[in-house]
Each structure stands twice: as C-alpha cells, then as structure tokens.
C-alpha cells in the first residue's frame, strides 16, 4: 500500500510555492470559463463529522472514516484502500478553515479509491454528507501535484478564512526502493452550497 507521508505544522496560511518551483505541478486550475461563483451567503453549519463522500466525475461514492496523528506527528492513513478518511483535528467540511480528506491511489492489489483523483478539473463537484444529515457541496478550483519533500502543510491544512476542502492522495513517480510514491496530489475546492435538515437550522 502506498502510504501518504504527510505531516502537520502550525495551522496558519502561508503563500503557495512559486509556479516555477520544480516540486510543484499544476494539473488543473480555475479559468475564466471554469470559474463557479459561490452564493452571496451560505448558512453556517454545526460541527459534525462527514460520513459519505461522492465525486460523481470519477465514480467515487464511499463512507468516510476519521484520521488523527501518529506519535511521530504524521497523518494516519485509511486502513482500507477503498475508503477515505477525514482529518478529525481539522474543521468539519463546510466550516471556516480547511477540511482535509485522504485516500489511497492504489495498492499491490490494484487501484484505490482515489486512483482517478488527479483527473478532476476545475468546476467538478464534490459532495459530503455529514452525520447530522447536512449536505455540503464543493466545487474544485485547482489540482496540484507536490513533491513529498516540499509538501506545503500549512497551505493544505491551514485556515484561510474561507470554507474549503482539500482531497489528498499519492502520485507522481513510484520509488520501487522505498515502496512509496514521491509526490502527493491535492485537489483544492471551495464550498458553494449546503442543505441543512430542518431540525438543525439555526434561528
């Protein structure tokens, strides 16, 4: 199984790496034609863990587990290559900040749940159902490949003052000596709508 080697530093916004950086490959980004404007006002939601992830474009419809930190401060990874995990020390998808969901690209047995993640394009939709029944809808803004040796922890996990969701998996070249991929694929997306059960609507 190709593990996701990610660490978390201080959770605050930093500038993204320069476009000319050889460790960064932009696979997709928002253009004038692909830009999707968010509604002027999206209602606040209560904290509730995500339980179901759907990405229709790549055929993903799976349960969401929870992930924490290992003793060495590396992010845990899902035990099953066909499920995903939400980093539970971050915000609920739809709250202010960066919610992060991780999944495997493949294993020795074949493709994993995020095998086609890198094929997403700006404007594609991502839906998450929360435990309280709230549905949060996100739109992809860009897809970037980062070298693991220069992974921008704070950019991916930090609070940007917006309601964002990052999807992370492995990618790039595979190092047969270590048994791991050399890069990570990160899909950046932003909240565009929520559907809150009547019992949960705040007055």
Model feature map: region roles:
Residues 1-3:
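N-terminal Sec-pathway targeting helices
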Residues 7-203:
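Solvent-exposed, non-transmembrane regions of membrane-associated and secreted proteins
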């Amino acid at each position: 199984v190709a593990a996701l080697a990610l660490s978390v530093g201080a959770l605050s916004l930093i500038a993204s790496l320069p476009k000319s950086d050889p460790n960064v490959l932009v696979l997709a980004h928002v253009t004038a034609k692909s830009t999707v404007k968010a509604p002027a006002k999206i209602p606040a939601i209560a904290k509730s863990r995500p339980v179901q992830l759907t990405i229709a474009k790549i055929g993903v419809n799976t349960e969401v587990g929870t992930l924490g930190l290992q003793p060495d401060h590396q992010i845990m990874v899902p035990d099953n290559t066909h499920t995903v995990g939400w980093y539970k020390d971050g915000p609920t998808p739809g709250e202010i900040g960066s919610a992060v969901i991780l999944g495997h690209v493949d294993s020795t047995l074949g493709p994993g749940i995020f095998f086609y993640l890198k094929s997403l394009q700006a404007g594609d939709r991502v839906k998450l159902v929360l435990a309280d029944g709230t549905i949060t809808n996100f739109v992809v803004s860009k897809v970037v490949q980062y070298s693991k040796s220069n992974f921008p922890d704070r950019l991916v996990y930090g609070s940007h003052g917006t309601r964002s969701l990052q999807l992370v998996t492995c990618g790039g070249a595979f190092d047969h000596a270590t048994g791991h991929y050399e890069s990570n694929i990160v899909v950046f997306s932003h909240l565009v709508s929520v559907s809150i059960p009547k019992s949960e609507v705040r007055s």
